[in-house]
């Protein structure tokens, strides 16, 4: 029997990574059962405990993540030494930006063990607004590392077409045209557009649906330059009659955060970096109106009524030019919240079916192990 090994991303309690650690193994295992027959066993390769304090403004701890990944590599190496990795096994990296995939490929190739590997891409230096993109940019060592990791994966999973196109344009070269990266490799199954495995969100958010709403507008993002918190702070000054809260600054627990989503009328984004966006989906599940720019992944994910023109918040200067329009947009959504409830339901359906369901991910893995 084949085995599926989840090489996970370290869990931070306030991030979705802790939820994936709890839910993904069970969700994946349920899809690998046919009647009473187990098609494959799911095992996790965890790197142990990790610092809960992320590097300021970042998604994870830049030091701790390397300790975590090194521990994972040690376990993988020991598995090969003990003969525990077999033909037909599948390794799923829940964060594709993990250099240990190169050593995994090295061991499998040299030992003649026929495995397949999938990686879920979130961000990298190819995104100029991401932490790596801002601090490292197009440094040769980083771009070549990303190309190498991409090559190691048999399936590269992306949650949005926007992400695929950005990846291909940045990592394509003069001799490897962009259309090859995006179209040819997509047709061959090397690139797979699929929703993230977050079916649990709807159940998880149910207790917070139906809460009494108040005139609360949330900034649910990391406080980082690519999320443009200064625009949100200025909006708060323009609309003093409403309550504006930057969630990360409150030190919320996950439950506190979900309660805030349940009570809020609006979730606001002026992001210049987003390859999926989870918080606005969580908000929509509890009838909180998303206000998002018509750019990035929002462009393909959002229905028209919840997107505003991208130029309004491309940067702070453009925001100042269009501040009156943004202020009126926020005021309308707060004052007429109930009018938008049917549209919120429509938005939830789009997001749930196409972007926050792991069905295509599971289907791909199932096919790779022969079912």
Region locations from a protein language model:
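Conserved donor-binding/catalytic core segment of Leloir-type glycosyltransferases
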Residues: 198-227, 233-237
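Short hydrophobic beta-strand element within catalytic cores of glycosyltransferases
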Residues: 289-292, 299
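Donor nucleotide-sugar binding/catalytic pocket of nucleotide-sugar-dependent glycosyltransferases
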Residues: 151-205
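Active-site proximal beta-strand in glycosyltransferases
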Residues: 90-96, 108-131
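Membrane-proximal helix-turn-helix segments that form the acceptor-binding/catalytic region
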Residues: 135-156
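A charged, aromatic-enriched C-terminal amphipathic alpha-helix characteristic of glycosyltransferases
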Residues: 313-371
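Aromatic "clamp/platform" in nucleotide-sugar-dependent glycosyltransferases that forms part
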Residues: 271-272
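N-terminal pre-catalytic "stem/leader" segment of glycosyltransferase-like enzymes
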Residues: 1-103, 371
């Amino acid at each position: 029997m084949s085995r599926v090994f989840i090489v996970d991303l370290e869990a931070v309690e306030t991030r979705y990574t802790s939820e994936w650690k709890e839910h993904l193994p069970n969700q994946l295992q349920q899809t690998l059962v046919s009647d009473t027959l187990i098609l494959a066993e799911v095992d996790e390769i965890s790197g142990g405990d990790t610092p809960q304090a992320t590097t300021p403004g970042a998604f994870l701890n830049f030091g701790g993540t390397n300790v975590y990944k090194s521990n994972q590599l040690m376990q993988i190496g020991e598995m090969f030494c003990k003969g525990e990795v077999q033909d037909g096994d599948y390794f799923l990296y829940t964060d594709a930006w993990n250099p240990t995939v190169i050593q995994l490929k090295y061991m499998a190739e040299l030992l003649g063990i026929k495995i397949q590997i999938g990686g879920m891409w979130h961000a990298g230096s190819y995104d100029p607004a991401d932490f790596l993109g801002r601090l490292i940019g197009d440094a040769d060592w980083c771009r070549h590392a990303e190309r190498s990791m991409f090559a190691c994966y048999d399936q590269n999973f992306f949650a949005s077409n926007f992400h695929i196109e950005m990846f291909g344009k940045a990592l394509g070269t003069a001799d490897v045209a962009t259309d090859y990266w995006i179209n040819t490799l997509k047709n061959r199954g090397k690139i797979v557009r699929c929703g993230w495995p977050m079916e649990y969100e709807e159940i998880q958010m149910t207790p917070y649906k139906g809460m009494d709403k108040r005139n609360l507008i949330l900034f649910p993002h990391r406080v980082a330059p690519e999320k443009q918190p200064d625009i949100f702070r200025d909006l708060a000054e323009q609309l003093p009659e409403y309550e504006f809260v930057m969630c990360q600054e409150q030190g919320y627990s996950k439950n506190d955060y979900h309660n805030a989503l349940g009570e809020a009328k609006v979730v606001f984004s002026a992001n210049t970096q987003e390859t999926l966006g989870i918080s606005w989906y969580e908000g929509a599940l509890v009838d909180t109106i998303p206000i998002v720019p018509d750019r990035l992944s929002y462009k393909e994910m959002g229905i028209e009524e919840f997107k505003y023109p991208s130029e309004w918040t491309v940067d702070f200067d453009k925001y100042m030019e269009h501040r009156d329009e943004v202020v009126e947009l926020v005021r309308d959504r707060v004052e007429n919240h109930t009018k938008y409830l049917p549209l919120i339901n429509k938005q939830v359906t789009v997001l749930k079916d196409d972007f926050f369901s792991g069905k295509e991910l599971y289907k791909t893995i199932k096919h790779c192990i022969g079912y």
